[in-house]
Swiss-Prot record:
Disulphides: 19-477, 57-288, 70-82, 105-149, 292-316, 484-488
Sites marked Cleavage: 340-341
Subcellular compartments: Virion membrane; Host apical cell membrane
GO molecular function, a single term: host cell surface receptor binding
Glycan-bearing residues: 25-26, 38, 179-180, 300, 494
InterPro entries linked to this entry: Capsid_hemagglutn (IPR008980), Hemagglutn_HA1_a/b_dom_sf (IPR013828), Hemagglutn_influenz_A (IPR000149), Hemagglutn_influenz_A/B (IPR001364)
Membrane-side (Extracellular) residue stretches: 16-525
Lipidation (S-palmitoyl cysteine): 551, 558, 561
Organism, scientific name: Influenza A virus (strain A/Singapore/1/1957 H2N2)
Family: Belongs to the influenza viruses hemagglutinin family.
Region forming the signal peptide: 1-15
Membrane topology: Single-pass type I membrane protein
The protein's name in its UniProt record: Hemagglutinin
UniProt KW Signal keyword: yes
């Protein structure tokens, strides 16, 4: 009878229940936090762009200036091989090969060439302006050329420059000036010819000891030719040295020379400024558009970081060295373990998420006589979703300051500066990378803690409604001391549960259950005594049987003494 009673006690019908839980899915997304690595979450957002299209494109609808085989110097001076660049429209950036073939056809140098390239990073269009027409030099020959710049086998020269030489065995002082009334700054380039020997000097200029003088309100430069024997380049032992200046509005530039002057025929009015740059690339322009260009290809993204290439032009994310930057937006993804039953711990007491709850992050599962089912808590889910969305957008917005990083060039005399610049840039990249990774780790920690807190808050909200009308099962579930139909369950979920309505029924059932527990104690004691006696008797019978068997086959000698 006692055994039957005990069985009935253990197989009593479970009361109606409601449980608090959270969403789980089949996601394999992993994030890192300050304290953990590779935490699987239900939802995440990658904020690091890793891809490009491998193309050189128009930037915001404006094509780049494609120099082809020409260098910056070849374009601006007018190398005959660069005639297609004599007039160019507005550009978004400049495409220059690493080692362009057509630069200074007449061998020489270009002073402050790297600074000139830096100037071009803020210019989007030059307008060519004739400042010193070739026919104004009536006392000098202006048809000078060289086979080094030949066109179709005939000697030629830089299209935008004029090489002044003797005329009629005479070279009078050459003077020219230009007043900048264009309304914009103007780029002016001129040159000085350095002959190979004195014979060449007299042949071209008649004079020895010549000079070239250039002056503006901010510039006073006087040069004399260096006559020297040099190794031949392009068949020439002489050299040309080019210089440049920016002529301000309403300022005047004056040229004076007794020989060796390479005069400018054209200046370049800076007609449009803006973010530009020189893209070192061997590629060609393709039929595509982008907002961010790298030497490897275009990036089209709204993400705040990328790891494609450190050099960019346009509206670009920040470059970082990271391989992974993923923000958690969902919860820890811990699907329920079937062997543990339906419920189980996020927030410290719920062991697994519900894949059956698909319309919210947090919610309920109930079971009663009418059935069972899942229901999301829309209010807490929506608040959490809005909060996390706003946070992610804020992080992206704060870190998505459009960033442009064009390469800086240094002359051979500035290698120490170049090395220092590289170290500084590497240092900045390290700082950006560290900041980005730390930001992600901290935000992920906060997001997961935020979800844990929301689940616990929902649990506490339900517990405050139900009070002692239920029993806390310790796994996120409550068992009612009263019958709770679907209407009752819905009232718990929407926060309108009527505690007084069920208080009396719950009190009676609670006391009854306690009485059953107390009366069952005697049963447990009887069963314990019965089990002990039965076990001892069974052991004694078994030992006696073994002894009798051993005595009968001689294995054990039995002596009975009286």
């Amino acid at each position: 009878m006692a055994i039957i009673y005990l069985i009935l006690l253990f197989t009593a019908v479970r009361g109606d229940q409601i449980c608090i839980g959270y969403h789980a899915n089949n996601s394999t997304e992993k994030v890192d936090t300050i304290l953990e690595r590779n935490v699987t979450v239900t939802h995440a957002k990658d904020i690091l762009e890793k891809t490009h299209n491998g193309k050189l494109c128009k930037l915001n609808g404006i094509p780049p200036l494609e120099l082809g085989d020409c260098s910056i110097a070849g374009w601006l001076l007018g190398n005959p091989e660069c005639d297609r660049l004599l007039s160019v429209p507005e550009w978004s950036y400049i495409m220059e090969k690493e080692n362009p073939r057509d630069g200074l056809c007449y061998p020489g140098s270009f002073n402050d060439y790297e600074e000139l390239k830096h100037l071009l990073s803020s210019v989007k269009h030059f307008e060519k302006v004739k400042i010193l027409p070739k026919d104004r030099w009536t006392q000098h020959t202006t048809t000078g050329g060289s086979r080094a710049c030949a066109v179709s086998g005939n000697p030629s020269f830089f299209r935008n420059m004029v090489w002044l030489t003797e005329k009629g065995s005479n070279y009078p002082v050459a003077k020219g000036s230009y007043n900048n009334t264009s309304g914009e700054q103007m780029l002016i380039i001129w040159g000085v010819h350095h002959p190979n020997d004195e014979k060449e000097q007299r042949t071209l200029y008649q004079n020895v000891g010549t000079y070239v003088s250039v002056g503006t309100s901010t510039l006073n430069k006087r040069s004399t030719p260096d006559i020297a024997t040099r190794p031949k380049v392009n068949g020439l032992g002489s050299r040309m040295e080019f210089s440049w200046t920016l002529l301000d509005m309403w300022d005047t530039i004056n040229f004076e020379s007794t020989g060796n002057l390479i005069a400018p025929e054209y200046g370049f009015k800076i007609s449009k400024r803006g973010s530009s740059g020189i893209m070192k690339t061997e590629g060609t322009l393709e039929n595509c558009e982008t907002k961010c260009q790298t030497p490897l290809g275009a990036i089209n993204t709204t993400l705040p970081f990328h790891n494609v290439h450190p050099l960019t032009i346009g509206e670009c994310p920040k470059y970082v060295k990271s391989e992974k930057l993923v923000l958690a937006t969902g919860l820890r993804n811990v699907p329920q373990i079937e062997s543990r039953g339906l419920f189980g711990a996020i927030a410290g007491f719920i062991e697994g998420g519900w894949q059956g709850m698909i319309d919210g992050w947090y919610g309920y599962h109930h079971s009663n006589d009418q059935g069972s089912g899942y229901a999301a808590d829309k209010e807490s889910t929506q608040k959490a979703f809005d909060g996390i969305t706003n946070k992610v957008n804020s992080v992206i917005e704060k870190m998505n300051t459009q960033f442009e990083a064009v390469g800086k060039e240094f002359s051979n005399l500035e290698r120490r500066l170049e090395n220092l610049n590289k170290k500084m840039e590497d240092g900045f990249l390290d700082v950006w990378t560290y900041n980005a990774e730390l930001l992600v780790l901290m935000e992920n920690e906060r997001t997961l803690d935020f979800h844990d807190s929301n689940v616990k808050n929902l649990y506490d909200k339900v517990r405050m409604q139900l009070r002692d009308n239920v029993k806390e099962l310790g796994n996120g579930c409550f068992e009612f001391y009263h019958k709770c139909d679907d209407e009752c369950m819905n009232s718990v979920k929407n926060g309108t549960y009527d505690y007084p309505k069920y208080e009396e029924e719950s009190k009676l059932n609670r006391n009854e259950i306690k009485g059953v527990k107390l009366s069952s104690m005697g049963v447990y004691q009887i069963l314990a005594i019965y089990a002990t006696v039965a076990g001892s008797l069974s052991l004694a019978i078994m030992m006696a049987g073994i002894s009798f068997w051993m005595c009968s086959n001689g294995s054990l000698q039995c002596r009975i003494c009286i």
